Amino acid sequence: MPELPEVEVVRRGLEDHMVGHTIVSATVLHPRAARNQLGGGPEIEANIAGLRVSAAKRRGKFLWLELIDAPSGETRPDLGLLVHLGMSGQMLIKEPDAPISPHLRAKVELDNGDEVWFVDQRTFGYWWLGDLVDGVPERVSHIATDVLDESADFSAIARNLKSRKSEIKRLLLNQEIVSGIGNIYADEMLWQAKIHPLQRADRLSLARLEELLQAGKDVMTKALAQGGTSFDALYVNVNGNSGYFALSLNAYAQTGEPCGRCGTLIIRESFMNRGSHYCPNCQKRR
């Protein structure tokens, strides 16, 4: 599943290609693409045409387009199109005569003739059109800030983590504590901070927890600079290009490879129906 850096790459692409343009029409081609929408696809199609995209925003793994009334020029958006990429969703900028993808689920046409496609092979992603509350779609108002958010309070997040008697990796994956972190970046930030994934959060100092959050920010900033992490053709930016941070991973998917710090072989253990990758020497459980 795309995590924070991958979604941010897509958001930036949509910002470049959509902001300032008016949506001429929308077409929802698969019911699952609007499965959370009251009224389904027709509700999106009927209410989005004629609106102008004023901004492309993101929180964690969710992104949305802020929409305003084009004729009136209203500058305070109260409506947004939420996009969740799911496991394999792609938002692609296409010319009108581009060959149709068999996995095209929804699309919008812009006033400059470009089309924006939502391509989703596994159909876990979706669009949702709804109200913004304090600038955030109602549907994701419960999602916490992420480590790249300028408003993120690492001290407050660290206190929240320390108050819980649970494995630190489990908490990092909880989108209501800190958002945008999935299995890849949890493993990477834990490796950088030299913390075992099963270490209980309440047994870590506040200083160590803040170091961990800073490690997450550092790792994700580097990943963003490299276009995110792509292991297959399902994750691409709006132009269809893959990221290359997979070449810089230190822990995730590095089973049997020497640790970049000490040379001990990275191991993988099952965790929450997925795998945790870590160095048994650098990341000892305390």
From Swiss-Prot:
Entry EC no(s): 3.2.2.23, 4.2.99.18
Record SUPFAM superfamilies: Glucocorticoid receptor-like (DNA-binding domain), N-terminal domain of MutM-like DNA repair proteins, S13-like H2TH domain
Record field: catalytic activity: Hydrolysis of DNA containing ring-opened 7-methylguanine residues, releasing 2,6-diamino-4-hydroxy-5-(N-methyl)formamidopyrimidine; 2'-deoxyribonucleotide-(2'-deoxyribose 5'-phosphate)-2'-deoxyribonucleotide-DNA = a 3'-end 2'-deoxyribonucleotide-(2,3-dehydro-2,3-deoxyribose 5'-phosphate)-DNA + a 5'-end 5'-phospho-2'-deoxyribonucleoside-DNA + H(+)
Catalytic residues, chain numbering: P2 (schiff-base intermediate with dna), E3 (proton donor), K61 (proton donor), R274 (proton donor)
Residue positions binding DNA: H103, R122, R164
GO biological process, one term: base-excision repair
CDD domains: EcFpg-like_N
PROSITE patterns given in the database record: FPG_CAT, ZF_FPG_1, ZF_FPG_2
Pfam families noted in UniProt: Fapy_DNA_glyco, H2TH, zf-FPG_IleRS
Assigned keywords, A-Z: DNA damage, DNA repair, DNA-binding, Glycosidase, Hydrolase, Lyase, Metal-binding, Multifunctional enzyme, Zinc, Zinc-finger
Family the entry assigns: Belongs to the FPG family.
Role: Involved in base excision repair of DNA damaged by oxidation or by mutagenic agents. Acts as a DNA glycosylase that recognizes and removes damaged bases. Has a preference for oxidized purines, such as 7,8-dihydro-8-oxoguanine (8-oxoG). Has AP (apurinic/apyrimidinic) lyase activity and introduces nicks in the DNA strand. Cleaves the DNA backbone by beta-delta elimination to generate a single-strand break at the site of the removed base with both 3'- and 5'-phosphates.
Complex and partners: Monomer.
Protein known as: Formamidopyrimidine-DNA glycosylase
Gene designation per UniProt: mutM
